[in-house]
Amino acid sequence: YEIRLSLVGSEMCIRDSVHPVTGEVFSVAHGNAMIYKYDPEQNTMVATGVQLPDAAGKNASKVKIRCILFDKAGTTVYMSSQNKHVIYKGDYDMSKGEFSNLHIWVGQYDTKGFTEGQGNEAKLEEPCQMDLDEEGNIYVAVRKKHRIAKITPDGMLTNYTGTGLSGTTDGTLDKAQFNHPEGLQFGPDGALYISDYWNHKIRKIEKD
């Protein structure tokens, strides 16, 4: 590339996301947990004024967002924080271009572990990339626990596959093992593809 764009200047930005309907580009700065939006007229990312909350509902900081995921309608947004061990959820108004109701949806802020459960009763350690299936369930790579978790639309987290121990075993969902999975995405064939980081492999889970 001859021209490169610095998305958020001195604030470290790890992931961005393109809105599925409007084509808008968003990112979250690590330093102040602020959501940024690309302004084509200024050719730069500008702050929206919306910051992610911490456990007390105050403005968070040093939140390492690994995935920004919109639903197909573009009205709901999910964000995974690797270092705070939570999944955020919020609303997006396309007509106004505004986020609202951003809250910690699943997991416990700054608390490590892996516990199946509803919403903030659940625990997950280092959630990374996420994707949605046709029924609205979210699948998330839980890096530190070597698991792929499933979250239902009402916020129930369960283990989808992975034993919790690092390994490279193929097999059924209850026996397969991973080693720090970070990325995942559904392919056009309906299969779930997983970037298994320390195994240096792309794994595939066939569609049922």
Where are these regions (language model features)?
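Short loop/turn segments immediately following beta-strands, especially the blade-tip
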Residues: 38-45, 89-98, 206-208
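A short loop-to-beta-strand structural motif that recurs across blades of beta-propeller domains
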Residues: 33-37, 85-89, 146-150, 156, ...
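Residue-level detector of Asp-centered blade-edge/turn motifs that repeat once per structural unit
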Residues: 18-22, 70-74, 132-135, 186-189
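Blade-level signature of beta-propeller repeat domains, shared across WD40, Kelch, NHL, RCC1
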Residues: 180-208
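Gly/Pro-rich loop segments of beta-rich domains
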Residues: 4-6, 10-11, 15, 42-66, ...
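Conserved beta-propeller blade signature
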Residues: 24-27, 76-79, 137-140, 191-193
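Short loop/turn segments immediately following the C-termini of beta-strands
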Residues: 30-31, 82-83, 92, 143, ...
